[in-house]
Amino acid sequence: MSTWLLPENIADVLPSEARKIEELRRRLLDRFRSYGYEMVMPPLLEYLESLLTSGGADLRLRTFKLVDQLSGRTLGLRADITPQVARIDAHLLNRQGVTRLCYAGHVMHTRPRGLHATREQIQIGAEIYGHAGLEADLEIQQLMLDALHLAGLSRIRLDLGHAGVLAALLARDAQAAERGESLYDALSGKDVPLLNELTDDLGADTRAALRALPNLYGDASVLAEARTRLPVLPEITRALDDLAQLASQAKGVEVAIDLADLRGYAYHSGAMFSAYIDGVPNAIARGGRYDHVGQAYGRSRPATGFSLDLRELARISPVEARGTAILAPWAQDDALCAAVAALRDAGEVVIQALPGHDHVLDEFACDRSLVERNGAWVVEPR
């Protein structure tokens, strides 16, 4: 076996891609900071039970497992940073008011999520803890869209759903609740024959409501139809009101409502949103409310947030990250060394051409040169 081969769906990040990823990472983290979010850096490795407090069977299957040589306990390589940030908020920070946290780091998946997807993503995201009102969801939605615009993306479609609708329907019908997982699978796959089979012997109101969900999709006007076809329950009314506000505040993007889109249902407790762009089949960013995540760490707090994969964002972003630079000669000259140091201190990229290698590097656009004029080193256009 060749020593240079990597595992399937694992790849090196080469300079051009790395430069773009880093440019986007800095832009997004700076924007998060401008909203008041504080950076945290959870470890890549944790005890397995700490990583799998939420997310259900899917997260368990995606998590690499290994044995700790010190304790003998099972460890996991994180597949999602969100539970780790919830642990930090619940157990370490222990603040009483609103906490805004952000992060950026690698996550590993045992299996790729698509044919050409990587198993090593660079996840970046932001979370708000401590506020149960819709204001927090609106801020997270705005921040997510702001981040995508900052990455140069346009023609964004925002898909909105709400975990509270199905939860309310199951809560009022014990027989339906017993089939919750099967109903979730049928609705998520829009498998109408299976849905009809699962609901045949349910109460008339519950049966009609569940069968209506796959057809309740479209623009924001579908919410009016949902109010006529779904039971008048406080939880459903509140969910539809929340979706109406989220849709109205999503400026400059196309909005789609899908009350049967339940991806992440086991994880989310309220509004759910996903962002798409033309030509990319999968969501480029996902978010929503997950109020119960901190409960496993001894302190349940209202929470909402979003995340995305920086590697995928860099692949589709039109942002140009090829930096400009100053080309300087290599010489043992005190004045030259001082000039180069001063330029670098000022934030300039200065590349000194090593002897015999005077070509301009492809990774930088050397648009200026450092040359000696009348005993002084000056920068001139190339």
From Swiss-Prot:
Pathway entry: Amino-acid biosynthesis; L-histidine biosynthesis; L-histidine from 5-phospho-alpha-D-ribose 1-diphosphate: step 1/9
Phosphoprotein is among the record's keywords: no
Cellular component, GO annotation: cytoplasm
Signal sequence region: none
Broad class of the protein's primary localization: cytoplasm
GO biological process: histidyl-tRNA aminoacylation; L-histidine biosynthetic process
Subcellular location per the Swiss-Prot or TrEMBL entry: Cytoplasm
Single annotated GO MF: histidine-tRNA ligase activity
Keywords: Amino-acid biosynthesis, Cytoplasm, Histidine biosynthesis
Superkingdom of origin: Bacteria
HAMAP family reported in the protein's UniProt record: HisZ (MF_00125)
Function: Required for the first step of histidine biosynthesis. May allow the feedback regulation of ATP phosphoribosyltransferase activity by histidine.
Oligomeric form and interacting partners: Heteromultimer composed of HisG and HisZ subunits.
Protein family (similarity comment): Belongs to the class-II aminoacyl-tRNA synthetase family. HisZ subfamily.
Remarks, miscellaneous: This function is generally fulfilled by the C-terminal part of HisG, which is missing in some bacteria such as this one.
Name used for this protein in its record: ATP phosphoribosyltransferase regulatory subunit
Native source organism of the sequence: Burkholderia orbicola (strain MC0-3)
Lineage: Bacteria, Pseudomonadati, Pseudomonadota, Betaproteobacteria, Burkholderiales
